[in-house]
């Protein structure tokens, strides 16, 4: 089969994988297409952790796969987890050729699946539309290779770079369309991270309000001194709400745990939570993608540590004045050479606002 045909069928597999965009955590999003004589005869995708993987779901849709080609967006697994190995299912079904978009970064798999298929007599090809497939699973890849999640921070600002009035009033700088777009960012995320200042000021729910099936993100508060109120709205929601702290106050911890919070003590650095330790802890919790929704203090600290992989900034066509609050609280930079630089990735309209997508120039995406 030609490279053009391989790319065509892999593109379809990638579209199928997107069906799991909001539901597969902590697993990767994977799609599979089975082809015989240049015709798609079976399709499937991974829906949810613990349920069938994409290859198995595709095989379920047909009675005979002998001699066919399977296009899979991620290397088929070769180990026993919550489900049996997908490699075995493909081999038993009589698949003759397996085309994979990318090798699995999971060290339990990482090349072993391709090797097993090869040894069983399957023709194997890897790297077809790899970049597009990787983009679907940035968080999973980050957790497996960097031992921390892919971190995205959402910011909303005026034309003059202000996030709130001097009083702290911020509802609403951006439009209803921009705020609705944020809900999709939440739905795509494994966790939403905020700081105690935002909790005390806004008391947010930090849930994803979308009209599709979604695994609700884990809510995470960075709270150095355990100041989170027991009345915080997010404690009333289903799912996990975590408070990460440096405090060893067992009384405060017990009070928060009694209303539904999980409280974890982490290392500190210069009197505050060690943000690198936070990211490693979140990876240990099987969190792939983190969305930061916080104020200038936490965003400034994350920027200073180069811990944000992607910045999503909604800019409204309004001006709040020079007394308004800024995007980042950071130590004063002494010279132009110390400036923080970014790389543009996308600019588009969302209603009357602009949605700007950038990464820190010092971080490889």
Descriptions of predicted regions:
Residues 29-38, 155-156, 356:
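Short beta-strand scaffold segments in enzyme catalytic cores
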Residues 34-132, 218, 249, 303:
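Zn2+-dependent cytidine deaminase-like catalytic core
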Residues 5-25, 143:
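Short, basic/aromatic recognition patches
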Residues 304-342:
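Flexible, gly/pro- and Lys/Arg-enriched active-site loops
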Residues 13, 31, 77, 117, ...:
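Residue-level signal for inorganic ion chemistry
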Residues 105-108, 131-132, 200, 227-229, ...:
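Short gly/pro/ser/thr-enriched loop/turn and capping motifs at secondary-structure boundaries
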Residues 142, 148, 152-159, 163-288, ...:
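Active-site ligand-binding patch in enzyme domains
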Residues 331-365:
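Conserved histidine-centered catalytic loops in small-molecule metabolism enzymes
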């Amino acid at each position: 089969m030609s490279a053009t045909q391989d790319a065509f069928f892999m593109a379809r597999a990638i579209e199928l994988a997107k069906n799991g965009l909001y539901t597969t955590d902590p697993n990767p999003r994977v799609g599979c297409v089975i082809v015989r004589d240049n015709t798609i005869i079976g399709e499937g995708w991974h829906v949810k952790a613990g349920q069938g993987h994409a290859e198995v779901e595709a095989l379920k849709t047909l009675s005979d796969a002998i001699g066919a080609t399977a296009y899979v967006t991620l290397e088929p697994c070769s180990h026993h987890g919550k489900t049996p190995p997908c490699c075995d299912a493909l081999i038993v079904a009589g698949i003759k050729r397996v085309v994979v978009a990318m090798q699995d970064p999971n060290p339990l798999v990482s090349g072993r699946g391709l090797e097993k298929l090869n040894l069983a007599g399957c023709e194997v090809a890897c790297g077809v539309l790899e970049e597009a497939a990787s983009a679907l699973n940035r968080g999973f890849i980050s957790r497996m290779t960097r031992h921390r999640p892919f971190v995205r921070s959402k910011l909303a600002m005026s034309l003059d770079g202000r996030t709130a009035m001097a009083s702290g009033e911020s509802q609403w700088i951006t439009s209803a369309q921009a705020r609705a777009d944020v809900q999709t960012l939440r739905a795509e995320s494994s966790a939403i991270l905020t700081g105690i200042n935002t909790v005390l000021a806004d008391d947010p729910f930090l849930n994803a309000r979308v009209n599709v099936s979604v695994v609700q993100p884990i809510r995470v508060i960075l709270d150095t001194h355990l100041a989170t109120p027991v009345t915080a709205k997010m404690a009333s929601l289903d799912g996990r709400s975590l408070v990460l702290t440096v405090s060893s106050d067992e009384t405060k911890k017990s009070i928060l745990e009694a209303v539904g919070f999980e409280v974890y003590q982490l290392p500190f650095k210069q009197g505050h939570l060690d943000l690198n330790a936070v990211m490693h802890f979140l990876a240990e919790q099987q969190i792939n993608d983190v969305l930061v929704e916080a104020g200038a203090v936490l965003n400034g600290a994350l920027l200073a540590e180069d811990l944000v992989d992607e910045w999503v900034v909604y800019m409204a066509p309004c001006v709040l004045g020079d007394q308004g609050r800024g995007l980042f609280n950071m130590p004063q930079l002494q010279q132009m050479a110390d400036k923080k630089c970014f790389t543009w990735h996308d600019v588009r309209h969302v209603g009357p606002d602009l949605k700007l997508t950038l990464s820190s120039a010092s971080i490889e995406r």
